[in-house]
Amino acid sequence: MREEDLDWEEIGLRVGLEIHRQLDTSRKLFCRCTPELVEEVPKEPKVRRKLRPVQSEMGEFDPAALEEFKRDRTFYYLADGSFSCLVELDEEPPHEPCSEALDVAIKVTLLLGGSVVDEVHVMRKMVIDGSNTTGFQRTMLVGFGGEVPTSEGPVRISTVCLEEDAARKVKGRDQDLEVDYCLDRLGIPLIEVSTEPDIRTPEQAREAAERIGEAIKAVGGVKSGIGTVRQDVNVSIEGGAVQEIKGVQDLNLIPKVVKYEALRQANLLRIRDELRERGVSETDLIDCEPMDVTDVFEDTDSEVIRRELERGGVVYALLLPGFEGILGWELCPGRRFGTELADYARRRGVSGLFHSDELPKYGISEEEVEAVRQRLGAEDGDGFVLIAGPEDRVKSAMEAVKDRAIMALKGVPAETRRARKDGTTEYMRPRPGAARMYPETDIPPVVIDEDRVKELAEELPEKPWERKERLAEEYGLGEELVEQMFEHGVVDEFEEIVEETGVEPKVAAATLVNTIPRLEKDGYPVDNLTIDHVKEVLRLYAEGAIAKSGIEELLGALAADPDSDPEELAEELGIVMASEEEIEEVVEEAIRRYEDKIRERGMAVMGKIMGEVMEVLRGRADGKRVSELVRERIREISGE
């Protein structure tokens, strides 16, 4: 199935969102450390840890945690007293939750039209990928309900939570089986807004994510910049399974991620049907065991295999009955079913795999392929995979590949996947289950009293989507200009400038979203500009003291010398509007130069005269007034 064949309603597309944003508080969520990232990662102290899953209160292991444990990874944590303490190292109990962060979460809940809980209970969410020293992430439900509007209908809000951000990955070694983490990011407050799976199209997913992001930003108290916003997308289709896609950084990438994931699931369902039609059963695959075929590749031309053998590694093959043609089946652009198997293999510490649908290739000869098929007892229609590397890792990777091949008979396994820059995704781990969550025993519940909620409700800003409509209507602005002001975060400044200077709204908006960014691009130190600078420049324009063309020049000069007086600077730059007498003098001088041609050609020379006059005045005169004067003098001379 191709992308253009997808009908969202027909395939039953369902999408939910989880929007995360770091909060700009004075302390971390569960300690007093400063919530900032360090410029230089410390080398010491360095703490070594191994993490293991524990059973839930029901005696169950979370499948995602169990899968991580099978990778047998080692983690090293780099800490420094300037940004972390014993809480981050899990050597001291957590402190009470940050009240600033809690206030932001309450306000976001209220702005979205949701309800705030009476008591906040901190929970532990098991995570043993090394990003949390404790082996779990602390999270708390603050609100539920509400909705955001989209052009395709409202999207309901499921929950608003507060959680601690994860440690920052610094470096991975040996196929990520050893990882260094910096503890500066661990514990920074993070708000998470989750939706119900109400979204029905890829574009609606982007729109809903934008609306939620606007609401969080409108409340304030949030960080900005790279890495402060993370968007997870949950996607499923009819007959498929929910996939949690992590880390979609770019808002505009969301539609592509949704499309490609829907396409991937649709093709996995087709593969399931094809395997069933071929009569492949789970028993057929269970009976297949990995086989050592190292001797087949003793003199191989494959650089990958030869390198592993030189390191003392082995080569194993696994028969996949009935999988011929399936392994090379494209699921979405650039991703085949064989790629899915390779993802599972890599999680066990090998560099990848070869599959029969792509062989002979990569230095593996036809003779070697045939020798492997004979060793495995492969028949027509069968496929196989090859993995090279250390024997223990190869065996573990083969186990994962075999499990994934068996899953193909059932359709689409529920997974947590990572978003890639091209919009495709790759396997990370199984979807977590209910056994993942259990109560935090070190922090008592936080009671949210009604007075606190009422006080915060009085501080709520206007809903961003309603404010956009009002700005467009009240100030006569186009939708694109309004959107640009929101993107640049200058809406408050815009309204303040218009109210205090009386300048035309379109000029004020264009100055904030076009002129100042252009000056920055040209190398001007625009960080030196304050809103008072902008107001004074636009006031001069509104009063007719400078021309519109002088706005950018004056702002650039003020950026370079912010202590200057704007009016005096305008005089020095020669951008003060010309007086009526000066305009008349310049016009008269041009008329004298062209008097003979005026008598010959009349109005035909008006364009040349206008050009010269405006060049002399350098935009310091209203073009309409200049045109009137020139036209009047030409008529007097030519008699037209």
Curated annotation (Swiss-Prot):
GO terms for biological process: glutaminyl-tRNAGln biosynthesis via transamidation; translation. Gene3D superfamilies: 1.10.10.410, GAD-like domain (3.30.1360.30), GatB domain, N-terminal subdomain (1.10.150.380). SUPFAM superfamilies: GAD domain-like, GatB/YqeY motif, Glutamine synthetase/guanido kinase. It comes from the Archaea. One of its GO terms (molecular function) is aminoacyl-tRNA ligase activity. The keyword Transmembrane does not apply. One of its GO terms (cellular component) is cytoplasm. Keywords: ATP-binding, Ligase, Nucleotide-binding, Protein biosynthesis. It catalyses: L-glutamyl-tRNA(Gln) + L-glutamine + ATP + H2O = L-glutaminyl-tRNA(Gln) + L-glutamate + ADP + phosphate + H(+). It holds the Pfam family GatB_N. Its EC number is 6.3.5.-. It is an enzyme of class 6 (ligase). Belongs to the GatB/GatE family. GatE subfamily. Allows the formation of correctly charged Gln-tRNA(Gln) through the transamidation of misacylated Glu-tRNA(Gln) in organisms which lack glutaminyl-tRNA synthetase. The reaction takes place in the presence of glutamine and ATP through an activated gamma-phospho-Glu-tRNA(Gln). The GatDE system is specific for glutamate and does not act on aspartate. Heterodimer of GatD and GatE. This is Glutamyl-tRNA(Gln) amidotransferase subunit E. It comes from Methanopyrus kandleri (strain AV19 / DSM 6324 / JCM 9639 / NBRC 100938).
